Amino acid sequence: MSFAESGWRSALRRRGPGTPGPVARPSYSSFTQGDSWGEGEVDEEEGCDQVARDLRAEFSAGAWSEPRKRSVLPPDGNGSPVLPDKRNGIFPAAAGSRAQPRRWPVQVLSILCSLLFAILLAFLLAIAYLIVKELHAENLKNEDDVDTGLLGFWTLLIISLTAGFSCCSFSWTVTYFDSFEPGMFPPTPLSPARFKKLTGHSFHMGYSMAILNGIVAALTVAWCLM
């Protein structure tokens, strides 16, 4: 019999039969869990130390992660944190704040490049129109009053094919830069596997329209020069 059990029994004898005594919990006592004196108390202290260490680790981890959360999520006017929308793994608010100083020069440069390209294209089309007009006007009439062109078949064919190829190349390039696979080389009307899964089409309609534009341009030039 241990010292704790003898003290507990003597306390019960001293109390009267009508006096309520404290509820004894011998199964949860730290003195009766071990075989000898103080063994259960040592085990309980070790468990408490382990819990305390775990709590300290959690508190330290929370203290380290809290400034990062505050830096990423700034508080609102009422003190509540603002949760930004995350798209493709990037916070657009942070990205927009960094790209804000460089936004207007890029836009101005793109507008100037577009205007320069449009002016160059208009200049080339004007030259082509003058050439086609002069070639169409240079016709001779024979004795039977039949117009005879100065251009031969092969010359007419080469000019028509050159115009059609130029138009097709321009449309093909625009479609290439505006397609779902701009990094694919060489560009092909046949759709890659990813594009086929997205749209369900087995061919790229934009490249087919580029080829059709070239054919129409070649036929138009040939008809004008005849």
From Swiss-Prot:
Q: Where is the composition biased (Acidic residues)?
A: 38-48
Residues that bear Phosphoserine? 2, 36, 60, 65, 80
Where it sits in the cell: the answer is:
Nucleus inner membrane
Q: Where is this region: Disordered?
A: 1-48, 66-85
Gene Ontology CC: nuclear inner membrane
| Superkingdom of origin | Eukaryota
Which terms are listed as keywords in the entry? Membrane, Nucleus, Phosphoprotein, Transmembrane, Transmembrane helix
InterPro entries with a match to the protein in the record: ARL6IP6 (IPR029383)
Membrane-spanning ranges: 111-131, 150-170, 205-225
Query: How does the record classify its membrane topology?
Result: Multi-pass membrane protein
What family is reported?
Belongs to the ARL6IP6 family.
Q: What is this protein called?
A: ADP-ribosylation factor-like protein 6-interacting protein 6
The organism of origin for this protein: Homo sapiens (Human)
